[in-house]
Amino acid sequence: MRKDIVKILPLGGQAEMGKSMYCIEIKDKIFILDAGFRFPEINKLGIDIIIPSFDYLKENASRVVAIIITHGHDDVMGALPYLLEAVNAPIYAPALTADLIDQMLKRHKKHNNFKINYQLNRVKRNDSIEIEGVPVEFFPVTHSIPGSVGVALWTRDGYIVYCGEFIIDFGAPEGFRCDIQKMMEIGKKGVLALLCESSYSKNSGYTSPKHKLTDKIDNIFEDSEGR
């Protein structure tokens, strides 16, 4: 069987916090996974944000078929207005993330002279779709914002799996819940490469999900007097 030519090019998020962005090339088609910014170091005066370099994408703009955003935080979607000025490809995102993207781009149109018409496609967290002949699987992951997803792109040699930012928490409420079963199904089909988030992976123990803070905050408000 003839194999696909696959290239994986990280443009941000490597050995740094934020600015996440990957380019996956399958059969000469480019898929962009996330497009975030990061804030500069405290001594970098006069710089508001730092975004990835889009030079490679500008040179290959005709081959970019999709921009996939995994969740609604600036470190994975904040550079999108600047990316669209360089490469205007269809955007795919889960519902809440798509709403946040829409609001962000409308703000840029109003305040930053952003004039790009964009195509925003809403996907479900468990969707299986096809983009330009390439099967794409979405799977729910647990993160501090609801509606977060991971993405699996099919190749003849196996899936390229991009987890996004995640923790494993089987007690998460609906909207935050991950789908281990869907991940297992993708794994059984064969995985060529796993692109996995590693923030705080050197820390021992478990990460406490932010969505579990609600009960503790509620108690503080209820027990406080004179307010």
What kind of feature is each model-predicted range?
Residues 1-68, 73-227:
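His/Asp/Glu-rich metal-coordinating catalytic cores
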